[in-house]
Amino acid sequence: MLKVIQSPAKYLQGPDASTLFGQYAKNLADSFFVIADDFVMKLAGEKVLNGLHSHDISCHAERFNGECSHIEINRLIAILKQHGCRGVVGIGGGKTLDTAKAIGYYQKLPVVVIPTIASTDAPTSALSVIYTEAGEFEEYLIYPKNPDMVVMDTAIIAKAPVRLLVAGMGDALSTWFEAKACYDARATSMAGGQSTVAALSLARLCYDTLLAEGEKARFAAQAGVVTDALERIVEANTYLSGIGFESSGLAGAHAIHNGFTILEECHHLYHGEKVAFGTLAQLVLQNSPMEEIETVLNFCQKVGLPVTLAEMGVKDDIDGKIMAVAKATCAEGETIHNMPFSVTPESVHAAILTADLLGQQWLAR
C-alpha cells in the first residue's frame, strides 16, 4: 500500500494573521464570499474584510445561521452565485468552517478557513461533518483536498475561553499515541494510505510540544495574551495534530470518545475533554509503561483535563454504563480496530475502569 501525507496548501499563524492574510489570499481569488455567525462577525469580521480590501480583493459577507446542513449550504451557495464570488472564507468555529469547506467543494472554489478558537484539529482537514436542520448527525463529507489556506490569528484565539484551548490540547494529546498505533498496525489513514515517517514525526512533535508548553500556554490564555508558549500550543493543537491525525490515523482514543457520546451525562464535555480520557484508556489498553501513563496523568491534571469517570460526569451504574460505552467503542467500522491487536468490548471495559482508578489514585496523591 502507498504511504500518503496531505495538508493545507498554506498555513498562517500569528497575532493579526486575520488581517495580514490578504497578501496570500490574492493569489487564490480576486473576490471572496465571507461567512460567519453574528457574534464572530462582530469579533473578527472587520479585521478579515479589511485584510481583503487592503489588497484590492472584493468580498461579500453573509450571516451563517449556525448549522452545517445541506439546506444552509445550498442557501449560501445561492447567495454566492448572485454575487459572483470566486473564493470562500469561513470565520469562526467548526460548523462555520465545515460549511465554508462544503461550499468551496460544491462550487469548485478555493477555501480559506479562519478559526477563532483552537479547540480541535479539524480546521486543517479535508472533512466536514454534516448535520440535519435539527442538529442531528447526518454524514461526513470527505473532500479530495484540504483547505487552500488556514489562518490562525493568535490575538483572537488568546481572548477565547481558556477551556476551549485546553480542550484542543486534549484532542492533540491523542495524536501521537493513535498515530503510533496506526503506524504499527499499518492501518489506512484518512489520507488514503499508510502513514509516512514525516506524519508520524509531526505527531510526536505535537506530543512533545504539549508537555513542554501546555501549562504555560494555559496561563497565557487565562491572561488573554499571546506568548511563545501559546503560539506553540496553537500550532500543536491545529497544524501538528491536524496533519498527524489525518495522515497517520485514529485508533483507540477517538473510538472511546465516540463510545462516551452515548452517555447523556457526558454531553456537557468538549470533544477534546473526552478524547483526553480516551487517551488514558488507550494507554491502559495497550499496556503502556507506568511512567508514560503517569506523564499523561500529570499533564492532564496541570492543564485541567479529566482523568476520572467522576470528572466526566459518570457517577452511578458505572459498570453497566461503561460496558455500553465499550460496546459502542467496538462497533463495526470504529477506529478502535486500527489498534495493532485484537480489541473486544470486554478489554475496552477493563481499560476504562482501570484508567479511572489510575486517575483517582493520581488525584489523591
Curated annotation (Swiss-Prot):
It is an enzyme of class 1 (oxidoreductase). It catalyses: glycerol + NAD(+) = dihydroxyacetone + NADH + H(+); hydroxyacetone + NADH + H(+) = (S)-propane-1,2-diol + NAD(+). Mn(2+) binds at residues 171, 254, 271. Inhibited by zinc. CDD domains: GlyDH. Its cofactor is Mn(2+). Pathway: Polyol metabolism; glycerol fermentation; glycerone phosphate from glycerol (oxidative route): step 1/2. NAD(+) binds at residues 37, 94-95, 116, 119, 125, 127, 131. Keywords: Glycerol metabolism, Manganese, Metal-binding, NAD, Oxidoreductase. InterPro entries: ADH_Fe/GldA (IPR001670), ADH_Fe_CS (IPR018211), Glycerol_DH (IPR016205). The keyword S-adenosyl-L-methionine does not apply. Glycerol binds at residues 121, 254. Disulfide bonds: none annotated. GO terms for molecular function: glycerol dehydrogenase (NAD+) activity; metal ion binding. One of its GO terms (cellular component) is cytosol. One of its GO terms (biological process) is anaerobic glycerol catabolic process. Homohexamer. Catalyzes the NAD-dependent oxidation of glycerol to dihydroxyacetone (glycerone). Allows microorganisms to utilize glycerol as a source of carbon under anaerobic conditions. Exhibits a rather broad substrate specificity since it can also oxidize 1,2-propanediol and 2,3-butanediol and reduce dihydroxyacetone. Cannot use NADP(+) as an electron acceptor for the oxidation of glycerol. Belongs to the iron-containing alcohol dehydrogenase family. This is Glycerol dehydrogenase. It comes from Citrobacter freundii.
